[in-house]
Amino acid sequence: MSNFLIRKVAVLGAGVMGAQIAAHLVNARVPVLLFDLPAKEGPKNAIALKAIENLKKLSPAPFGVKDDAKYLEAANYEDDIAKLAECDVVIEAIAERMDWKHDLYKKVAPHIAPNAIFATNTSGLSITKLSEGFSDELKSRFCGVHFFNPPRYMHLVELIPTAHTRPEILDQLETFLTSIVGKGVVRAKDTPNFIANRVGIFSILAVITEAAKFGLRFDEVDDLTGSRLGRAKSATFRTADVVGLDTMAHVIKTMQDNLADDPFFPVYQTPAVLAELVKQGALGQKTGGGFYKKEGKAIKVLDAKTGTYVDSGAKADETVGRILKRPPAERLKLLRETDHPHAQFLWSIFRDVFHYIGVHLESIADNARDVDLAIRWGFGWNEGPFEGWQAAGWKQVAEWVQEDIAAGKALANVPLPSWVLEGAVAEKGGVHTAEGSWAPASKRFVPRSDLAVYGKQVFRAPLVGEAGADPKTYGKTLFETDAVRAWVDDRAGEDDVVIVSFKSKMNTIGPSVIDGLVQAIELAEKDYKGVVIWQPTSLKLGTPGGPFSAGANLEEAMPAFMMGGAKGIEPFVKKFQEGMLRVKYANVPVVAAVSGIALGGGCELMLHSAKRVVHVESYIGLVEVGVGLVPAGGGLKEAALRAAEAATAANATTDILKFVTKSFENAAMAKVSSSAHDARAMGYLKPSDTIVFNVFELLDAAKKEARALAAVGYRAPLRAKDVPVAGRSAIATIKASLVNMRDGRFISDHDYLIASRIAEAVCGGDVEAGSLVDEEWLLALERRAFVELLGTQKTQERIMGMLQTGKPVRN
């Protein structure tokens, strides 16, 4: 089979979505041409150039590293259109106007390479209608590729073919989008707004309709429909503000214009409050006001009755809040039976969505799985709507929905289809089973895609009722304690690498985790090719996602502190350091599979591994200053070793300060990387470390790296000796700048003390510049500083504040 290579991509349209799609492709190291109209004044590429500059200012940041903006090449349709022939994929992302898109297609079509894929990022226009006027050959290479905003962070991409799109085109794109760009791909039918926006926007319209019926405020609704339901924290109206009220109004209009025969058509009317806000130019976050408005430090919410902004903060009824913590079946039953408006409102919005997806599944998606994944990945729900229905008791909920339809309480007078109430789905208790997910058109449960790219996903996004592998029990367990599980993937050819997964809260590291890790390494040295440290929590999507490790387990260390004071902690610190050295000098490669946060001791564990395989959305740093301490698990020691290595390579061992400054600043300022690429720029990742874009491929990639290292005769590094250090003169230089910061009141006296101890550790202590030390010397400096600081009242205040409130104390 020949390789499908994407060497360069063109993005047509440098607006909000086009520019951000281009930025994320650059994150994935795909060269991109960003096209827009030629400017009427100044440089012809001014529009695209301005868009690239604006990307640097956006929050959340579209680039993993801001400087990567230089890899985006600006272009215009007048001077650069011939460059389209260099591109293997062309993605159109201009405004949602069918006529504008057709005009652009006429202009660019003759210049698209004969084997290139042509795609549109439309959020809901008909792909078939967009392809009208194309040659049959170009139609066969055309499809919809719908990214969600913001493209870097939203996992979903919908792939929408027409009747003419060649199947291999879709397979090639799905493979590229999944593995290289890191997305979750759902194939949708060419119906208005596809799957995610069709169901997601309906759910928002249902919320607005039912909220008005029950007389609820917007902030009240958001407290009810956000994290309490396992959905995005921004809930309903805050989400609308973030998306943009004009964008939302456009998506609703697409439904109005194209779904006149839909029994739910009355719901598709633009809500009066939304229409009025758009008319006033209050488009949400981008204009400074929408359903919410920031006034000074206060967040105000729109009062629908008066049209004025009032103080926000309305909360869910306490009884209803308690109901929402009950198991799914009990929760839905209690909501339905409770008279409080909040409970009735919640039952109503659940019923409305269940009714809608039951009626429309066959027309909008191939199967129920695609609906659930689209809503989870595109709208940030922890559970898709079909999953929620199935978890609450399929048949009982279906009967309740039918009763409300018959009573005229539903939003449409249309019955649930027969497949919901009888036959295989009713018998199996839902749409997701061990065989697959229900596809109404073919009347069967269809399995997951067997596209080769999914062979790299040991664990695919699980669904309620599906027979997916459970990462907490999967494979063959070698040993398990309260702190760790060591296991192997027992499939043929996969059982040669020991996988260690932590079981502690936030995967923090205490003595019991260290013991388990050392035991796993000893086991691997006898019978296996390597060790991978991988956490099942990595499968949690979102930002920052599930943690790799939040660092040392302070709570586990507290009894030793209470009994022996600061000195009583020293054995804990020494054990942590020895554990890290055991990782570093293991006789088999230890590979850290990192995603989410890797902070403090979690970062140090990663630094001591033979190799790091890191998900692009990883947030890495030594943050101990936040609790008044210094890194003492070898993180500062590793900084000194790397600085010495760099200085030796540059023949500058008498001027090591410039090589250690970045590491000092990283630790003293508790800097955390904004991405894996940023972590590499900060020095936490080496150029040889691997960055993975799809978190579901992380474990597979890490195992392959461990095997590859073993295959070439891996040997642990020799123990560090004769390490040149920056010494007392460098410490004095750093302290001089710290004094200025302290005297200018940028840092406190205690901040000064902590930063001084970090400087002493990374510079090798009170010795002459260029003096030679060993690893144990550097570790002793860390331990001494850690124990000293732990004995101070201000550090103890910081630790207690963090343990009690989860927030740093400034003192």
Residue ranges and their predicted role:
Residues 549-551:
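Amphipathic coiled-coil signal-relay and dimerization helices
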Residues 1-529, 534-540, 553-575, 581-588, ...:
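N-terminal glycine-rich phosphate-binding loop for ADP-containing cofactors
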